Amino acid sequence: MIYALPPYAQALGIGVDPSDAASPVLWFDYSDRVSGRPGFLHGGAISGLMEMAAIAALQSELERRGEPARLKPVNVAVEFMRGGTQQRTFASGTVTRAGRRVALVNASCWQDDPAKPIALAQLKVLLSPAE
């Protein structure tokens, strides 16, 4: 599946890993547009990357099921585990539950090792029929 990233994702320089993983992996490189305090990523950029990864995972899951829907994030909870440094940063999402009206998606953000996340997020998303 090819994802059309929204303008916000394009502004952050987010890319999609072309691998055939079950859930898309999104990434961005360290730059001035994602920097926070000297040498570290901005928390908002990390949150944005995880939100985009969660939405991509949910879109992928709904497409697999043949159930296209319009998505409206309702709540995003983020936990920062450690500071992100000046290197490529990745994120992916996992759909925990996708009902008829609501979906729950977890996202993880890492740099060197997916087993050592720099941040975790949980999104609640309203689903409505695609028009």
Spans of model-derived segments:
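Terminal targeting signals and extreme-terminal segments of soluble enzymes
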Residues: M1-E131
